Amino acid sequence: MTAKWEKQEGNKGVLTFEVSAEEFEQALDQAFKKVSKDVQIPGFRKGKIPRGIFEKRFGVEALYQDAVDIVLPSAYTKAVEEADIFPIAQPSVDIDQIERGKELIFTAEVEVKPEVKLGEYKGLEVEEESVEVTDEDVEKEIENVRERHAELIVKEEEAIENGDTAVIDFEGFQDGVAFEGGKGENHSLEIGSGQFIPGFEEQLIGKKAGEETEVTVTFPEEYHAEDLAGKEAVFNVKINEVKAKELPELDDEFAKDVDEEVESLDELKKKKRNELETNKKQEVENKKREELIQKASDNVEVDIPEAMVDTEVNQMVREFEQQLQMQGMTLEMYAQFSGQDEDALKEQMREDAAKRVKTNLTLEAISEAEGIKPSEEDIKAELEKMASMYGAEVDQLVQMLGGNTETLENDLKVKAAIDFLAENSKTK
């Protein structure tokens, strides 16, 4: 294999590579075996035509395309390895020379991963944030626990107050015409939750069970349904039932009911304080790392190829699809609900995708500059962790990955680069 790489403008270049005459001849042999199975010539059984007769009738050139299809994928892969380049998109390949008995010569226009010129990334400064948890924080968390364990008690005659839950039937009209998605029955609505359109919940305050009322609202300009965005609508609302929250008494029994690991309210407060401190430390550390990554990325000079952004956008769409599936939705259902098709979604994601690409390129460049490489032990530990998550053996997981742990190794390099940024940062 002879490969030659000529870099051109931007992130593109031309890769010239050859396949030996011997390899080309072997590919022609394979091509003949494939093609001859379907060739019918008088005097010969189908698939039994001699090679010489075939070539005399059709010419050896009839085998060229199939031979190229056979030899090109592996030849291109070897050429990429020899030239030590990292393609980011499918190449445009031309045949420069194809003749039996001679080398097969290809040229490929290839777009490659861009060069990254690192700026300052060591000793970056970040604000030091407090991880202190106050008594007020603990009391607020305890109140949240009380809220989660509250009982809903039916209010017979009392009017709706903020924080109550109203069970309602409703139907919305625009210019006197009912609109799609604007109707519901026995819907439980917590007043003050912000679950409905702004202004809707407030207009129910003071009403009682059994009453019917009209609620007039204006849909937000950014509302997902374009035909309703910014428009006024009137809802006919029937209040079927009103429920009020009854919070449990704040005592030792409450503490034991909500957490079997504690024996008193003081123990529950202590445990919640420890949990809050752990979470606060993690939040502060995560924020610090995100800030360091952003600063290092801002200091980088790189020409981001559109092909890499396209790939990242597609990945983001797949991730979004998985999130929708967890909610029992499909991308098509989301498009109908939001009025935003896949192309519009991709365009919306494009800016974030470009940022993600730049961030990854930055972290990869830092890992290269600092010689950061995961050890065999690191890779094994990560595989064991992943296998445990999927309930599989490590060997099974490696098989699922097609025997290729390159993506996993790259992820570990990126994580290690983030650790490096954090370990070499300063606080101010």
Swiss-Prot record:
Q: Name one Pfam family in it.
A: Trigger_C
Q: Which GO terms describe its cellular component?
A: cytoplasm
| Protein name as catalogued | Trigger factor
- Is Ligase given among the entry's keywords? no
This protein's source sits in the domain of life called Bacteria
Name the gene that codes for it: tig
Q: Where is the PPIase FKBP-type domain?
A: 163-248
Q: Family assignment?
A: Belongs to the FKBP-type PPIase family. Tig subfamily.
Q: Provide any one GO MF term from the record.
A: protein folding chaperone
User: Where found?
Assistant: Cytoplasm
Q: What does this protein do?
A: Involved in protein export. Acts as a chaperone by maintaining the newly synthesized protein in an open conformation. Functions as a peptidyl-prolyl cis-trans isomerase.
State which Enzyme Commission number(s) the record gives: 5.2.1.8
Q: Which InterPro entries match?
A: PPIase_dom_sf, PPIase_FKBP_dom, Trig_fac, Trigger_fac_C, Trigger_fac_C_sf, Trigger_fac_ribosome-bd_bac, Trigger_fac_ribosome-bd_sf, Trigger_fact/SurA_dom_sf
Domain remark from Swiss-Prot or TrEMBL: Consists of 3 domains; the N-terminus binds the ribosome, the middle domain has PPIase activity, while the C-terminus has intrinsic chaperone activity on its own.
Write out the catalysed reaction: [protein]-peptidylproline (omega=180) = [protein]-peptidylproline (omega=0)
Any one biological process term the GO annotation gives:
protein transport
Assigned keywords, A-Z: Cell cycle, Cell division, Chaperone, Cytoplasm, Isomerase, Rotamase
Q: Which residues cross the membrane?
A: none
